[in-house]
Structure formats: C-alpha cells, structure tokens
C-alpha cells in the first residue's frame, strides 16, 4: 500500500502503482489540509470575493463575473469545453500515472476541493478504471488542460474509459464498479485540469524506460567490445578519475566488471593502440547521458509533489493567482532526456556498423553473413538502426523553445512540455530497437570469436539472449528477431535478469 501525502511520492513508488497496481490511499493529515483549504474557498465565496475560476470565467474571460447560481455549472462546462484533445489515447500506464499524480498534487491542500474528489481519483486507480485520454492538444500551460479534462470527465460519468479490458462509457464502468459519479462543486473542475500531470506522467514512463536502457546499453556494449577485441585500457579507473565526472567513472567501472575474465579483450598496443570513439568513449558518452537522466529524475520528483493549480488557496485564507501550472521545468527536462537517450542509440548504431563492416570488424564475416553474397546477413539491420537514429534526431528537436500564444494572447508563452514528453517516449522506443539490433549482431559476432572466451558476465548475457533469438545460419525475416529482443529488453532490465537469474 502506497500512502500519498502530497509531499513525498518517489518515482520508485510511482512505478509500483503504475505497473504493479499496488493499492493507494491518502494520508489522514493530508486530507485534513484538503478540508481546511475547502473551508477557505467556501468562506471566500460567502464573503463575495472575486476568485479566478471559482466565480469568474477562464483564460481571457477571467474578468467575466459568474452569478452564484451558475458556479457549479461553470465547472462542468469547463470540463466539457476543454475535453477536445485528439489523437491516439495514452497507454493505460500513462493514465494510471496521471490519476496518481493528480491525486498527490491535490493532497497538498492548495486547491480548495473537497476530499471526495481525491477519493474518486484513488477509487479509479485502485479499481482499474482508466479514462480514455487522447494524446494531442496540450500546450503545457495552463498545464495540460485538454488531456486532464478527458481524465476528469470520467469522474462525473461522462466520456469513455477502459475497464476490465473493455472500452465503455464512463457511466457504465462506474455502475459496474459501484462508484457513484462525482458532482462538482465550485473550483473543483478547474482544480482537476489545471496542472502538469499529463506531461509529468508521460515523463515518468519515459524516464523509467530510459534509465533501464542506459544500464542495458552498457551490458550490450560490453559484448560488442569483446567481439571487436576492444582495448580495455580505455576503461582504466585512473583515466576517469582524472576527469571527475562520477557517472563516467561508474560506467567505466561497470565495463571493467562485465569484461573481467574475458579472453577476447586486448591491451593497449597488442592489436592496436586505441579503439574508435564508439568503443573507447563509452564511459564519457554513456556517462553524460546517465548524468542527464539523474537531473531528469530530480526534476520529475519535484514536479510529482508540486502544487500546479491556479489559484492556490492557503491555510490563512489567502487566494493567490500565479503560474505554477507552467510546464517549463518538465519541458526542459524532457528535451534533455530526448538528447541523452538518443545519444545511446547514436553510439550503438556506430558499434553496429563496426560489427557488420568487414573493413572495421577485425576479420568478422561481411555483415555477419553465414555465406556472404548469397546471404545478406545483418546488412539491412544496420539500415534499420540508421533509420531509427536519424528519426530520433528529428524528434530530439527541443519542444521547450517553441511557444505559441493562446487564449487571445493572455497565455502568450507556453511550454510545449507534453509534446516534449511524448517525443521523449517515442525516442526511447526507437533506442530500445537499436540496442536490440546491436545485441543481435554482437551475439552473432562473439560466436565467430568463440563463446568459450567470453567474460563470465557477458557469457550469462549471451546464453540468456540466445533463448530469445537464435543464431543466424541463413537469411530470415529479421524484423521478428528485433521485435522479440525489443520486447525482452522492455520486459526486464538485463542487470535484473543476470543478478537474479530471472527466467525469460
């Protein structure tokens, strides 16, 4: 059971809720803060104060005062009018993350809602009711209005959801689950949609997969190093201590560990003095990506526990309008993730080239073909890797430097954070496929060298991966192999498989 406080949710805990479906509850003390915030809103309404989004219109219509008899209708109108996102729906794990993060943000007690709103979000999460939320349509300020409106509509029994493996009207799922539809009070519609939970949810998913790939890429690279008689001296601890980047030194240490006991690695000057950069500079490049990912994690965990509503309601009764909904911190972090993880594939594709190019492969068969000429072997797999890394370069264009005015120029700078997060996720999927191709090629290459000469660690990787993809003895439809290895890499991290002896 994960207990949400609004202040301490971690990515590790979020993972358990998103993927393992661990139940979630709200901390009692946080719910008390929510009640106090709601009381402050009700007092402000009773006193006749003008409060944005409570008794006014929205965006450029903020100066329009709404009659007291229409305040609840205002909130449902907001959800309906803003639920106009388009495109394919977010995956269920992203929607689960959105539900989790919105509930956690509201538990901070700055949004002026009733506790029942949070209870409904958690009921959806714990019951496995996942609103259908189209991916496109958010500018990332004021938060993720369109996607979150689709999420919130399901709470009131409108829109569609996935429930028990079926797509159905939200009201039908609520009936089957025994959950009454929510009736919105003042401020609650705005509180549900004014936040960055779509981009942050997508960012958490992208980060979790990117982090796994960062570590997996080192294992796969180690196998390639052996296949190419790599020079181990480049990973000497003294080199990396001399520069001072912790992550670079960590990558070098892991490579030394993975390659310990190998009979295929060479020493400086034995076959050549030094390797090409895609081998020699693995610690420097992969380490830089890992360093960037750690910044991304820090940013996401701050945002996961942030109040991103507007206005914010404080315990002393103050109602302050600000801009915490602006997604720029997450947008920049997602753009950084895009660059960091794309670089892993850039390096991997160059190592693939060295495995298949007879001028670079230290005597391996051209394109790792069992019968070069008659059989093309891995030739086109390198093409596919080249295509994917080139696509990544387009996707990695920063979204956060793009802005377009909206709401009659009232919202004249936006973050495009959800676009950044969506593209980050696409890049991660491409990177995994490139690494799958490198692994397939490296497996074939080390067979040519002699698998009895592998290091103990890479030997484990070889034998586990060979259960997924067979040796290349003749040309076949290699897309199936790539898909199988891609799925294998996504299912569980290599380090977890080898450390725990997990079955595939």
From Swiss-Prot:
InterPro entries: Aromatic_Lyase, Fumarase/histidase_N, HutH, L-Aspartase-like, Phe/His_NH3-lyase_AS
The protein's annotated pathway: Amino-acid degradation; L-histidine degradation into L-glutamate; N-formimidoyl-L-glutamate from L-histidine: step 1/3
Modified residues (2,3-didehydroalanine (Ser)): 142
PTM notes: Contains an active site 4-methylidene-imidazol-5-one (MIO), which is formed autocatalytically by cyclization and dehydration of residues Ala-Ser-Gly.
Major place of residence: cytoplasm
Single GO MF descriptor: histidine ammonia-lyase activity
GO BP annotations listed: L-histidine catabolic process to glutamate and formamide; L-histidine catabolic process to glutamate and formate
Top-level lineage group: Bacteria
Reaction catalyzed: L-histidine = trans-urocanate + NH4(+)
Enzyme Commission number(s) of this protein: 4.3.1.3
UniProt-listed Pfam families: Lyase_aromatic
Presence of keyword Lyase: yes
Record's subcellular location: Cytoplasm
Record keyword Lyase present: yes
GO cellular component labels: cytoplasm
Crosslink feature (5-imidazolinone (Ala-Gly)) location: 141-143
Protein keywords: Cytoplasm, Histidine metabolism, Lyase
PROSITE patterns per UniProt: PAL_HISTIDASE (PS00488)
Enzyme class, UniProt record, top EC level: lyase
HAMAP family linked: His_ammonia_lyase
Family: Belongs to the PAL/histidase family.
NCBIfam families reported in the protein's UniProt record: hutH, PRK09367.1
Entry protein name: Histidine ammonia-lyase
Provenance organism: Geobacillus thermodenitrificans (strain NG80-2)
């Amino acid at each position: 059971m994960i207990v949400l406080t609004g202040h301490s949710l971690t990515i590790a805990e979020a993972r358990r809720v998103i993927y393992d479906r661990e139940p979630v509850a709200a901390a009692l003390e946080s719910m008390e803060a929510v009640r106090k915030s709601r009381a402050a809103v009700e007092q402000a309404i009773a006193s006749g104060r003008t409060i944005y989004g409570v008794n006014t219109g929205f965006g450029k219509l903020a100066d329009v005062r709404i009659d007291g008899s229409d305040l609840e209708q205002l909130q449902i109108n907001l959800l309906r009018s803003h639920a106009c996102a388009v495109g394919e729906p977010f995956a269920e794990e992203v929607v689960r993350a959105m539900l989790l993060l919105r509930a956690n943000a509201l538990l901070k007690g700055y949004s002026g809602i009733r506790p029942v709103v949070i209870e409904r979000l958690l009921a959806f999460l714990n019951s496995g009711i996942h609103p259908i939320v189209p991916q496109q349509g958010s500018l990332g300020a004021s938060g993720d209005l369109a996607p979150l409106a689709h999420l919130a509509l399901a709470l009131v029994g409108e829109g569609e959801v996935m429930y028990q493996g079926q797509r159905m009207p939200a009201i039908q799922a609520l009936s089957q689950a025994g959950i009454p539809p929510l009736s919105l009070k003042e401020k609650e519609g705005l509180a549900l949609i004014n936040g960055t939970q779509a981009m942050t949810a997508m960012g958490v998913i992208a980060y979790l997969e990117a982090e796994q790939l960062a570590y997996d890429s080192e294992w796969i690279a180690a196998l390639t190093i052996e296949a190419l008689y790599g020079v181990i001296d480049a990973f000497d601890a003294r080199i990396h201590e001399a520069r001072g980047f912790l992550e670079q030194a960590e990558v070098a240490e892991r490579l030394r560990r993975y390659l310990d006991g190998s009979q295929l690695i060479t020493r400086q000057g034995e076959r050549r003095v030094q390797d090409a950069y895609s081998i020699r500079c693995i610690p420097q490049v992969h380490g830089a990506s890992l360093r960037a990912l750690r910044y991304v994690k820090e940013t996401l965990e701050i945002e996961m526990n942030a109040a991103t509503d507007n206005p914010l309601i404080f315990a002393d009764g103050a109602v302050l309008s600000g801009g915490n909904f602006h997604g720029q911190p997450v947008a920049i972090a997602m753009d950084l993730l895009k660059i960091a993880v794309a670089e892993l594939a850039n390096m991997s594709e160059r190592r693939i080239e060295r495995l298949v190019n007879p001028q670079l492969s230290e005597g391996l068969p051209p394109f790792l073909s069992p019968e070069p000429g008659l059989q093309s072997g891995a030739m086109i797999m390198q093409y596919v890797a080249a295509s994917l890394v080139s696509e990544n370069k387009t996707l990695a264009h920063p979204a956060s430097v793009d802005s377009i005015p909206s709401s009659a120029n009232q919202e004249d700078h936006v973050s495009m954070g959800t676009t950044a997060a969506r593209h980050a996720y696409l890049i991660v999927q491409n990177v995994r496929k490139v690494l799958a191709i490198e692994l397939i090629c490296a497996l074939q290459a080390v067979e040519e060298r002699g698998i009895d000469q592998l290091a103990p660690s890479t030997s484990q990787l070889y034998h586990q991966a060979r259960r997924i993809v067979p040796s290349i003895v003749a040309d076949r439809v290699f897309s199936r192999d790539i898909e199988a290895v891609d799925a294998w890499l996504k299912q569980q991290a290599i380090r977890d498989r080898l450390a725990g002896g997990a079955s595939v």
